[in-house]
Amino acid sequence: MFGKKSSAQTVLILDIENGSVASALLKLAPGEAPRLFGEARIAVPLMDTRSAHSLARAVEHAASESLLHASEVAARLRHHAGALPPVSKVVIFMAAPWGVPNLAQGRPDFTPAFQELAPRIRSLFGDVPTSLHAHASAAVHGLRAAYPHEERALLLSVNGEVSELLMLEDARVVGHATAPVGLGTVLRTLKSHAGQSEHEARSAMRLGAQTEAGQAAAAHFAGEFKHAARELFGGQASGNVFVLAHEPASEWFARSLSHRSLAELFPQGGTVRAMRPGHLAPFVAHHGTPDTHLLLDALYTSASLAHGRGN
């Protein structure tokens, strides 16, 4: 008489990184693939000089904008497609340095930054449950889903100013390190060495132009990777490397790891592969051009809630 109550739920995903912030609505319903709506990513302005304080302020501002955008999208979707339930949960993913795995404790460590987000969430979505996760957890979960037979690998997650290295053995994370290098580092190198604008520098990365400045940027990135990886490996390097970066830069960073200076890290050789949206798209329904990191977050959130870990 009254109809069957839908058990579908809408989750807000907030992806906080050190070069951008993204948000998306995730619809979860029994028997259906998780579905993303209203994905949007806000880039943090590229700084000429790096400052932890100014970066944190810029990221917090972008996070506030992302929450406002998500609330507006949720309102429009409820108006035009009433089947989408109201947001019942907020899941926040934080990349280094905001959220990092603590392998000794078996749980992530989170920075106390972004204190203003909690009241912002309440003002826009009400008193809904909120959970925090390290983005590294979502990245590893997605790697296992896309490449279930790769039990020993190194995952390099490239971000704006800080990159993360995760070493997997028997499909478990056994090592974690960070490197103070990312997309921002490369763009600044191209701007200063080649006199390019930020737009030109991004285009050069997308086109893979082999300029002197581009080679210098790749060599610098490879050097920082080598320094972090050498301490992480302990002489047990895996030749299977996966690179996670925002498109269209993933292939550029993957190619940079073919630099000759890295040969000693992988004496047995190996492969370097970019994790692309196409590797994850079969697991998550979406509209338009998918965002690799949001796909990872959606896949992890769906699995976490299904197994009761998302509370």
Residue ranges and their predicted role:
Residues 168, 244-246, 275-277:
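Generic beta-strand/beta-sheet core signal
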Residues 26, 30-38, 180-203:
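Metal-dependent catalytic core segments for phosphate chemistry
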Residues 152-189:
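Glycine-rich phosphate-binding loop of actin/hexokinase-like ATP-binding domains
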Residues 254-294:
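Nucleotide-binding motor/catalytic cores of P-loop/tubulin-like NTPases across gene-expression machines
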Residues 191-227, 248:
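A mobile "lid/hinge" subdomain adjacent to the ATP/sugar-phosphate binding pocket shared
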Residues 136-138, 179-184, 271:
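Short, acidic/turn-prone active-site loops that include or flank metal/cofactor-
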Residues 1-18, 24-35, 41-153, 170-174, ...:
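Nucleotide/phosphate-binding catalytic cleft detector across ATP-hydrolyzing
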